[in-house]
């Protein structure tokens, strides 16, 4: 319940009874202070009047006063300027590292707040705060959605910056890894990222004019050129159709030339995947995109519009895959271009965060601004998360809105972080 005490203090949701210290002195909270989520006191620079005297300093909050000693704050000089120790239960006197007794105050959580909080944690329906959504003002909704959208973009930017570091500062390589991850479309995202780190782009660049060799390296590094990766019923046809053997021979030569080691093919997931999302198809599309030389980082960041970005990423498969989904398994001829739906998702999850991260890296606001513009222009995702929020009455106009709601579910609802959510704040005030 300590986090709930933090929440009550931060938002001044105090009980109707007057606040007072354990010695009976009246307390008036002028400013609860700045919430600190790192090491040190819980709230910085709070302003409280105690018995008519204004105190400015830090506030520490605990379930029980004795937690002060459990956390060894009595040995830590950073807590010497705590002007008020707020506790759910004051079960002992507390002293700082100088041996000085702290001013302490017992804070009760209002019954209404406690009731609403327990409801939020126990409701099985998603979102648990669905009852409050229709009554929220548009200002409250838009402010929180904008904050969530920025938070999600920052999160993706941090992931890209981590890839840049892993790629020794090579932004082109980090962009390729990011694009590859998003070609996994969720289910195979991690496998595609691992695969991309196994692709030596400098080596592949020497063979960029030969689509067969590009696809051989791409498929080989995915671990998909071993016979045992093909379902047994298709192995004979794969050996007879010639293409599998041709790729395997090319890869054998190139693997020796560049000292390549493939990833473990068992990382790929096929169960309940639509054939269009099979790794073979997505890898062939990436090979074709790389061969076309039109989807490099420079082309992407200079895309002036969403349509330009989609043209950069538009790709198909090599001819063999127009009639196959795996080696040896024939299908009706299909050009297997990236669908408009897939291009929309790639723009949301690759183009936008790359633009934002690259703009921040270069200190060029035009790229960051374009990232937000693209989010407003792109269609929203259509998945169960978005549909549930729409059923609650939220309007989802664009990809910025859908990204905000995905962030809300993953980082707040799923983690029961209602106390950090503005919708949760409104619910607790009911």
PLM features: residue spans?
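N-terminal "leader" segments that precede or initiate the main folded domain
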Residues: 1-7
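N-terminal ordered "arm"
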Residues: 7-66, 79
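Catalytic micro-motifs at enzyme active sites that drive phosphoryl/nucleotidyl and oxygen chemistry
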Residues: 32-37, 45-50, 68-75, 90-96, ...
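Short Cys/His-based metal-binding microdomains
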Residues: 63-66, 75-82, 88-90
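Short loop/turn segments at secondary-structure transitions that flank enzyme active sites
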Residues: 65-67, 90-92, 111-113, 185, ...
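Compact, glycine/acidic-enriched structural inserts
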Residues: 82, 86-144
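Hydrophobic, aromatic-lined core segments that form the binding pocket/scaffold
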Residues: 149-404, 417
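Cysteine-cluster motifs in flexible loop/terminal segments that predominantly coordinate metals
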Residues: 403-430
């Amino acid at each position: 319940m300590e986090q709930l005490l933090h929440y009550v203090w931060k938002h001044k949701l105090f009980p109707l009874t007057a606040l007072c210290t354990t010695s009976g002195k009246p307390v008036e909270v002028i400013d609860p202070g700045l919430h600190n989520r790192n090491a040190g006191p819980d709230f910085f620079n709070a302003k409280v009047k105690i018995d008519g005297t204004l105190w400015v300093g830090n506030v520490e909050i605990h379930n029980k006063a004795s937690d002060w000693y459990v956390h060894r704050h009595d040995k830590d000089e950073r807590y010497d300027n705590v002007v008020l120790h707020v506790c759910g239960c004051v079960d002992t006197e507390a002293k700082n590292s100088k041996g000085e007794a702290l001013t302490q105050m017992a804070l009760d959580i209002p019954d209404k707040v406690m009731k609403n909080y327990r409801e939020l944690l126990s409701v099985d329906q998603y979102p648990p705060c669905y009852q409050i959504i229709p009554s929220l003002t548009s200002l409250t909704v838009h402010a929180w959605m904008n904050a969530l959208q920025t938070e999600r973009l920052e999160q993706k930017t941090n992931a890209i910056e981590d890839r840049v570091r892993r790629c020794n500062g090579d932004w082109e390589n980090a962009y390729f890894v990011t694009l590859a991850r998003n070609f996994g479309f969720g289910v195979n995202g991690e496998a595609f990222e691992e695969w991309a780190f196994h692709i030596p782009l400098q080596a592949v660049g020497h063979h960029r004019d030969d689509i067969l060799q590009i696809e051989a390296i791409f498929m080989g590094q995915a671990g998909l050129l071993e016979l045992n990766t093909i379902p047994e019923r298709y192995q004979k046809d794969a050996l007879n159709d010639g293409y599998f053997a041709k790729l395997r021979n090319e890869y054998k030569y190139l693997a020796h030339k560049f000292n390549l080691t493939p990833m473990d093919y068992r990382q790929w997931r096929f169960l309940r995947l639509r054939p269009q999302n099979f790794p073979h198809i997505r890898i062939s599309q990436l090979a074709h995109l790389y061969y076309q030389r039109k989807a490099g980082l420079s082309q992407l960041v200079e895309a002036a519009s969403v349509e330009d970005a989609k043209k950069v990423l538009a790709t198909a498969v090599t001819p063999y895959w127009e009639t196959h989904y795996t080696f040896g398994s024939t299908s009706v001829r299909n050009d297997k271009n990236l669908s408009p739906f897939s291009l929309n998702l790639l723009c949301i999850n690759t183009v936008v965060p790359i633009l934002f991260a690259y703009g921040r890296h270069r200190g060029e606001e035009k790229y960051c601004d374009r990232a937000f513009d693209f989010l407003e222009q792109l269609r929203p995702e259509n998945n169960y998360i978005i549909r549930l929020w729409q059923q609650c009455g939220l309007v989802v106009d664009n990809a910025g809105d859908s990204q905000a709601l995905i962030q809300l579910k993953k980082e707040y609802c799923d983690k029961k972080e209602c106390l950090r959510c503005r919708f949760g704040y409104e619910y607790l005030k009911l």
